[in-house]
């Protein structure tokens, strides 16, 4: 079982590397990593387990956060209608994105960042993702609003980008016009 001790923190070189694509069929180790990542997210959202194991709540995690520079991510997040988006994605890529932008009212956080970073992280409000499941079956997934923000945050990790790289350095509280704010 993964714990917070397994997650690397900002400053670790794996967080700034562009992760390599996985090849299919996946190794048992790559499949286990995906399962463990999703299990971590589920456990971190269970109050009892989170307290017992000292887990910070998370809705997404990428392999580089575990010092594994492979294009693997997991998300476990509900949208505003309580629909669950629970996936392990291999080699995910953004196929398309909306012109409309969105951000979270309180900014973003990250399991690899042990400090609050004020500022808006403006992202696409809707994205379509191409990825593969653990069996190499192609997936085309659409996300909007909060789940779209989460999956973009995790794909950024696969590209060596941290969420705070998107914050306006001169004015972190600057919000461009016509950006939808969630939360």
From Swiss-Prot:
InterPro entries: Peptide_deformylase, Peptide_deformylase_sf
GO biological process: co-translational protein modification; translation
Substrates-to-products reaction catalysed: N-terminal N-formyl-L-methionyl-[peptide] + H2O = N-terminal L-methionyl-[peptide] + formate
Cofactor binding, per record: Binds 1 Fe(2+) ion.
Molecular function terms from GO: metal ion binding; peptide deformylase activity
Keywords of this entry: Hydrolase, Iron, Metal-binding, Protein biosynthesis
Cofactor(s) the protein needs: Fe(2+)
Chain sites annotated for binding Fe cation: 110, 153, 157
Enzyme class at the top of the EC tree: hydrolase
Metal-binding recorded as keyword: yes
Family of this protein: Belongs to the polypeptide deformylase family.
Annotated HAMAP family: Pep_deformylase
Function of the protein: Removes the formyl group from the N-terminal Met of newly synthesized proteins. Requires at least a dipeptide for an efficient rate of reaction. N-terminal L-methionine is a prerequisite for activity but the enzyme has broad specificity at other positions.
Protein name: Peptide deformylase
Organism expressing this protein natively: Listeria welshimeri serovar 6b (strain ATCC 35897 / DSM 20650 / CCUG 15529 / CIP 8149 / NCTC 11857 / SLCC 5334 / V8)
Lineage start: Bacteria, Bacillati, Bacillota, Bacilli, Bacillales
Gene: def
